[in-house]
């Protein structure tokens, strides 16, 4: 299995992918 790099900063993990979390970094 391919390991996903840890999601940090404004990113959250969803399943096996990282996505930009607007709740962590509101504009």
Swiss-Prot record:
Protein's UniProt name: AnmTX Sco 9a-1
Modified residues annotated as Hydroxyproline in this record: 6
Organism encoding this protein: Stomphia coccinea (Spotted swimming anemone)
Keyword Ion transport: no
Disulfide bonds: 7-18, 10-25
Top-level taxon of origin: Eukaryota
Keywords for the protein's UniProt record, in alphabetical order: Disulfide bond, Hydroxylation
Coiled coil regions, renumbered to chain: none
Function recorded in the entry: Has analgesic and anti-inflammatory activity in vivo. At a dose of 0.1 and 1 mg/kg, exhibits anti-inflammatory activity by reducing the volume of edema during 24 h better than the nonsteroidal anti-inflammatory drug, Diclofenac, at dose of 1 mg/kg in a mouse model of acute local lambda-carrageenan-induced inflammation. At a dose of 1 mg/kg, reduces the content of tumor necrosis factor-alpha (TNF-alpha). Demonstrates a significant analgesic effect on acute pain sensitivity in the carrageenan-induced thermal hyperalgesia model at doses of 0.1 and 1 mg/kg.
The family this protein is said to belong to: Belongs to the sea anemone BBH family.
UniProt entry tagged with the keyword Ribosomal protein: no
